[in-house]
């Protein structure tokens, strides 16, 4: 790369990076500005989501009251932007409103201390008290007729309750995307409550929304963790890699501009600034569609959709085709004598260009692998550019990439073979045993949830052709392991988990993969109560029954970490036969009591407990 070319790219990149696509004049009243931009319906929905994500224990009616008060105030400011308090920041307005909740101290304890602080510390304090695992009752789906009646009686309240229940259980759910889910939720009820067979129409749609919603929440949680724990630079690196894969024909300056704006949008949402976030996301979608010719040939269909569908579609759009005849990367990043000069001039720009060029050539790599390669390249340049002969030092840097690429390839190949051999449930069990032995201090419910989700990588990704397996699998595993990290951070019990979670975002999965059996772990004392079951297990769904059995499996491993696969399989086979036998018995409870004692004794003997 000629030096003059690099300088011109640097200028383009820097101006795009600092400018982005959002160019707004200052407004007298921020709340009036957002109300006008978003419209009353979206404004109210976003304020409800914001309050429910902060005050997760408050009753629905209390939140509706707060939302109505904020909405009426916003309307006052729309009518007269110079009216009293209309010039206050949104953080100040929302924080003041949260602090009026009478039961704040009683319900949230030390979170009430946030109200003594000034902005921006007050908002930071509220953010720190968001709970990823709130103590809320499990959502139980009512009968279809009951739901349809509630929908017809008061559609607005019905949909608000949906937003409220999801938002308070998922305090980092991407707010504009939750509006998209609510729109689909409404469409499902509108269609299916008029159908001849309401249940056959509605239930599959609700199951699909639930599963997609959980996945969306987990993906956004990783983005927020990236920003909160590793900073804006880490998020921008992720975004450069992902957008370069998705839009390989776009120029580097264009990708840089999109990265800047995407970072702003997600920073706002992760920071609780939901009105700004939704407004800026809409602007970003508008910009992408207006400039789709220079971004991607795959955007046409997305850009014809209404706003919420459009933004969702753009976020999920398939990768564009790679440009033909891209030159070798080695010329600019290894063979050139100007590498150290370019790197010293603007390190992040040069590394950003490396990541862009590498990612657009490798849609078959996971984003985290691309970031590992960029990190290795950066480390090599840091060392070599200070050496006597820099070029000689970094000449073989691409050779260092080979083991980094082969490690996830081999791991995915082995695990997909295991998945195909075992099927999802038994594959989950293999992962349960593996992870319980690695980090036995982690709570049993967390180990079960995380291992079940890790196990879904098989059915989600192993069916893909080789070229799509790694981006599917490794980036999915990053999302699931972040759930473990987030839950563990709240109540840390394992130094090994803390180390893997905090040292490097992109090396989390290799760190967990490399963990061996924890030899320092002192096995739990055997407790027969843990393995006592009752007739109610017979009425559980297949999924709930699996979770019961997997909970028992984790407990067995915690009692006997050195148990062999054969020993554990024998005990679990006996357990499955025991449940099947007693669920068929006339007197189920007696069967569970009598046969259960025999099973516990036989299991203890088999495992030498």
From Swiss-Prot:
Major localization class: secreted
Modified residues (N6-methyllysine): 558
Tissue localization of expression: Plasma.
GO molecular function, one term: DNA binding
Subcellular location: Secreted
The Albumin domain, residue ranges: 19-210, 211-403, 404-601
Residues where Phosphothreonine is found: 107, 444, 446
Site (Not glycated): 28, 44, 65, 88, 97, 117, 130, 160, 183, 198, 205, 214, 219, 229, 236, 264, 286, 298, 310, 383, 396, 413, 426, 438, 456, 460, 490, 499, 524, 543, 548, 562, 565, 581, 584, 588, 598
Modification type Phosphoserine: residues: 29, 82, 89, 297, 443, 513
Result of altering residue 24 to P: In Takefu/Honolulu-1
Residues reported to bind Ca(2+) 1: 30, 268, 273, 276
Phenotype when changing residue 87 to N: In Malmo-95/Dalakarlia
Name of the featured protein: Albumin
Organism: Homo sapiens
Lineage: Eukaryota, Metazoa, Chordata, Craniata, Vertebrata
């Amino acid at each position: 790369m000629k030096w003059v070319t690099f300088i011109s790219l640097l200028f383009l990149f820097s101006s795009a990076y600092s400018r982005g696509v959002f160019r707004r004049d200052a407004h007298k009243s921020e709340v009036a500005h957002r109300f006008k931009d978003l419209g009353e319906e979206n404004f109210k929905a976003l304020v409800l989501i914001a309050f429910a994500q902060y005050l997760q224990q408050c009753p629905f009616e209390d939140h509706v009251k707060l939302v109505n008060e904020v909405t009426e105030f916003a309307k006052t400011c729309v009518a007269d932007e110079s009216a009293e308090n209309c010039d206050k920041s949104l953080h100040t307005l929302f924080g003041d409103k949260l602090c009026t909740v009478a039961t704040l101290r009683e319900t949230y304890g030390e979170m009430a201390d946030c109200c003594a602080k000034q902005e921006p510390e007050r908002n930071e304090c509220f953010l720190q008290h968001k709970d990823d695992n709130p103590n809320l009752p499990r959502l139980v789906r009512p009968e279809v007729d009951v739901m349809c009646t509630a929908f017809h009686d008061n559609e607005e309240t019905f949909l608000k309750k949906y937003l409220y229940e999801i938002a308070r259980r998922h305090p980092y759910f991407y707010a504009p995307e939750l509006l998209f889910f609510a729109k689909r939720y409404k469409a499902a009820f509108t269609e299916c409550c008029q159908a001849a067979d309401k249940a056959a129409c509605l239930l599959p749609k609700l199951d699909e929304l639930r599963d997609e919603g959980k996945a969306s929440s987990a993906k956004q949680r990783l983005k927020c963790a990236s920003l909160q724990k590793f900073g804006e630079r880490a998020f921008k690196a992720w975004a450069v890699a992902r957008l370069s894969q998705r839009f390989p024909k776009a120029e580097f300056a264009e990708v840089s501009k999109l990265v800047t704006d995407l970072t702003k949008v997600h920073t706002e949402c992760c920071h609780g600034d939901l009105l700004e976030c939704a407004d800026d996301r809409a602007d970003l979608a508008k910009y992408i569609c207006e400039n789709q010719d220079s971004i991607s040939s795959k955007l046409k269909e997305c850009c014809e959709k209404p706003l919420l569908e459009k933004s969702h579609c753009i976020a999920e759009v398939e990768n564009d085709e790679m440009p033909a005849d891209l030159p070798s990367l080695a010329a600019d990043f290894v063979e050139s004598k100007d590498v150290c000069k370019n790197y010293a001039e603007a390190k992040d720009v040069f590394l950003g260009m490396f990541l862009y060029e590498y990612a657009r050539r490798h849609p078959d790599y996971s984003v985290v692998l691309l970031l590992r390669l960029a990190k290795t390249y950066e480390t090599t340049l840091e060392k070599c550019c200070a050496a006597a002969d820099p070029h000689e030092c970094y000449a073989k840097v691409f050779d260092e990439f080979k083991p980094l690429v082969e490690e996830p390839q081999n791991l995915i190949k082995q695990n997909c073979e295991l998945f195909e051999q075992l099927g999802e449930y038994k594959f989950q069990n293999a992962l349960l045993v593996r992870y319980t032995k690695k980090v036995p201090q982690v709570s049993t419910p967390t180990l079960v949830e995380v291992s079940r989700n890790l196990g879904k990588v098989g059915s989600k990704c192993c069916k893909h052709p080789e070229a799509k397996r790694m981006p599917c699998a490794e980036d999915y595993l990053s999302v699931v392991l972040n759930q473990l990290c987030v839950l563990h951070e709240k109540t840390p019990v394992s130094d090994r988990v803390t180390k893997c979670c905090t040292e490097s975002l992109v090396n989390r999965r290799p760190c967990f993969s490399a963990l061996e059996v924890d030899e320092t772990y002192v096995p739990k004392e055997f407790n027969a109560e843990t393995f006592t079951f009752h007739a109610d297990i017979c009425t559980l769904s297949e999924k709930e029954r699996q979770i019961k059995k997997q909970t028992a499996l984790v407990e067995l491993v915690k009692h006997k970490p050195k148990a062999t696969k054969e020993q554990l399989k024998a005990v679990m086979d006996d357990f499955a036969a025991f449940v099947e036998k007693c669920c068929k018995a006339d007197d189920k409870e007696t069967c569970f009591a009598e046969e259960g004692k025999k099973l516990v004794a036989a299991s203890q003997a088999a495992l030498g407990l």
